[in-house]
Amino acid sequence: MAVGITPDTIQEYPYLTVQEYKDAPTSIDYNNLVVGGNQAAQDAELANVILRASSYMNEYLNQSLVADQYTETQRVRVNGQGMIALHPNNSPIISLSSFQYGTDPNNLIALPDCSTAWFEAQQLIIPLSNLGINYSSQGPLGFAGSYGPRQQVFTEYTYVSGFVNTTIATATAGATSLTVTNGTGILAGQPYRIYDGSKSERITVASTYTNGSTTVPLTSALAYSHAAGVAIGNMPNAIKQACILITTAFLKVRGDNSMTMNLTTQPTVNIGNNARYSGEIALALDMVNKYRRIR
């Protein structure tokens, strides 16, 4: 028996690199996370905690803000203006690479030119005139390929959304290009920041950039050389700071909610770290509240 498999895709990425967290003023001893472990083990565990903190943020945000490509299926209805409005699961929407539609989910028709779509922060609008089909405000016409208002349509589409948050593969001072580990979401003409401590710098992608490529031409030469693994992107600093705060809170939490019996005084109860550091998490969530997706 054939098995149906969803085309919907889900990925999970960290909002910070290990070095970005280490460079932040957190007062955390991140070299003693694994008892007896070497530096590689300490860094691996720190990376795991950062990923868990990022996942916690995604749960609150109802989406991931790291630029990635998604394929989704959705049933929609043609509106009164003869348009199809898509509300993807992730935002902000950067690009649309494919769109298929039809009244039969097993026989969808592809949109020939995705550049004709109208982009909004959390929506994509597809006018039926761009699909080469007929539309009547009075309902479906009496021949194939016609649609009317409120008619249900099956759609499948692939898009990119989120903020670029990748790492450098190679970057040499004086060079007019660099390579990254993942080019998803990078756009020609857009500015991005390299997060490299005292050597941090801002770059702008040249108009010759090919969408999705890991080789990124620049409008001006790099001022510094940057090692592999250095973060680059346009992720808002508030989001990165929120991840730093949540990671710090996760690292501080220990099982210390105990009662201490003294000989000459009343027993005292220690305040658990999960309560003590809830303020850090609350501040972090407040910083990213504007990016929550309303479903």
Language model features with spans:
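Divalent metal-cofactor coordination and adjacent catalytic microenvironments
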Residues: 1-295
